[in-house]
C-alpha cells in the first residue's frame, strides 16, 4: 500500500488532463478510506477530515489524492495540501486542461493603411464644433429671459449665451450658475453691424435707444463708444452730393412757387396792419412790397400744408391706412422695409465710391515707367560725333538741344566739341548752311563766345580722334 501511494504522483503527472469520470470517482473513494485509517491511528481527526474533504473536492487531481492518502500524520497532510493547491492553480492557468488553438480564438487585425489614417485625421480637423442646437422642451419665454439675464448681468451676447446653454444640455439653472465663472470676449463689430449702425444713425441721429432697436445685441454704452470712434473716420459728404442736393432743393422750390402762383387764393395773402398807412405810395413801389409779402406767405403755407421734402401720400395708402389699425401698421412696416433697403443700397454705393476714390488718390505715379538717366561720358565715339554734326546742322548753336539729342554729353562738352573738332568736321560750313537756311538774326548763341574749358576736355586720345575724323570726313564729303 505505501509503495502504490508513492507512485501515485508520477502516474497522475503522466495522465494529467486525461482522467475520466470513473477514475476520478475511484480515486476519491480510496483517498477517503486512507484518510479515515490515518485519522484513527494518529488520533488527529480534524487534520484527517480536512485532508479527506480537500481530496474529495478535487477529484481530477491525482497528486492530491495520492499525497492525502500517504500522509501518516498531520504534518505530512499539510505538506501534501500545499503541493496539491499549487498543482491545481497551475492547471487553471493552463486553461483547464489545454490551449485554445484555432481561428476562432485569433484576433482579426486589419491591414495598415496610412492613406486611410491621414484621411480620418483630416476629417476630424475639418469637423466644426456645434455650439447651439434648439430644444423643444425650452419655451421661447424662458429662452428670452435667460438671454436677457446673460446680457444685462454678465455681458454675454446672444451667441455666447446660447453656447453656454448648449454646453449644459439646455439646463437653464446650470447655465445661469456657470455664467459668472467666465469672462465673455470683448464686443466685436462686424461689417454688417457697422453698416446697420450707419443706416440707423442716418435715420435717427444720436437717438441711441432707437438705434438699439436695429442692433438689439449692442448695449447703449457700446453704441456710444462706437459712435465716437466712428465719427472720426467717416468721410464727409462730397461736393457732388451737396451740389445735387442743392439743385434738387431749388427745383422743388421752383415747382412749389409755380403751384402757389397758379392756384393761390387772394385771401391767403397776409397784410401787415402797420403798412396800411402806406397806401398813398406810387404804384411803381408797391409791386416789390406785395411780392415780398407773397413770398413770405407762400413759405409759411408751404411749411404748413406740404409734407417734408421727398415724402408724398398716395390715395391707395390712405385708404388702406383708414381701413383698420392692423392695415395701417402693415403699410407702415412695408414702407419702413422699403426705406431700409433703399438706404442700404445707397450706403453700399457710397462705400464703393469711397473705395474707388481712395484708389484714384494714388495717381498714376506707381504705374509710370522710370526715367532712364544717362551719365555723361567724356569720350566721343564715332556715332556720337556724327550725331553731334547732324545736330549742329539742325539746331545751330543751341547747345542745350544738341546735348539733349546726344543724351550723354553736357552743354560744356558740346561747346568743347565745337572748338576741338571745328576744322576736322568743317563745323563753320555747317553753321553757315544753318544760318543761310534760318537767317543770321535767328542765331541762338554768340558766335564769338569762347567755351569754358572743363577738365574733361583735356582728355584726348590722338589715335581715336584721327580715326574718327577720317571716317567722318569721308562720310560728310560723300553726303555733301
UniProtKB/Swiss-Prot annotation:
It is found in: Nucleus. One of its GO terms (molecular function) is chromatin binding. There is a cross-link at residues 116, 291, 460 (Glycyl lysine isopeptide (Lys-Gly) (interchain with G-Cter in SUMO2)). GO terms for biological process: chromatin organization; erythrocyte differentiation; negative regulation of gene expression; positive regulation of megakaryocyte differentiation. Residues 1-105, 238-308, 436-466 are annotated as: Disordered. Expressed in the external germinal layer (EGL) and internal granular layer (IGL) of the cerebellum and in Purkinje cells (at protein level). One of its GO terms (cellular component) is DNA repair complex. Residues 272-282 have a biased composition (Basic and acidic residues). Residues 238-265, 328-363 form a coiled coil. Belongs to the CoREST family. Component of a BHC histone deacetylase complex that contains HDAC1, HDAC2, HMG20B/BRAF35, KDM1A, RCOR1/CoREST and PHF21A/BHC80. The BHC complex may also contain ZMYM2, ZNF217, ZMYM3, GSE1 and GTF2I. Interacts with REST. Interacts with the SMARCE1/BAF57, suggesting that the BHC complex may recruit the ATP-dependent chromatin-remodeling SWI-SNF complex. Interacts directly with GFI1 and GFI1B in a RCOR/GFI/KDM1A/HDAC complex. Interacts with INMS1. Interacts with SOX2. PANTHER family: REST COREPRESSOR 1, REST COREPRESSOR COREST PROTEIN-RELATED. This is REST corepressor 1. It comes from Mus musculus. The gene is Rcor1.
